[in-house]
């Protein structure tokens, strides 16, 4: 147990940094372009096999998809806000899904985790009683904020 505790303590600063980054750059459903690209980049570095975008999402099954103009505007914003260029194009048009497989080479059951990345269409509180505002990681995207923990799920 001591090694697990040590591992968690070692990872904690990076996990906090990632969560605050996702919180700061909140993106609504189907426009999580920056978030998905950051996640994809990290999973690739960790050695996961990756499938994404149109390879994992059926276009006709998406509900609540923004109009084409909104998708284009949000895609441009994600690129401006630092979405890794190598990955972001796979998600263009509202195909912000990722399937990551870690092949351990060991026999046994397959375990799946489902993680939501989208923010809510709400405005973040802008007063010092709200920790993200006070500590400088409140959403910089007006009308989008993580209010239900998906920034934590994604981390």
Please annotate each region the language model reported:
Residues 2-146:
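Acidic/His- and Gly-rich active-site-bordering loop/insert found
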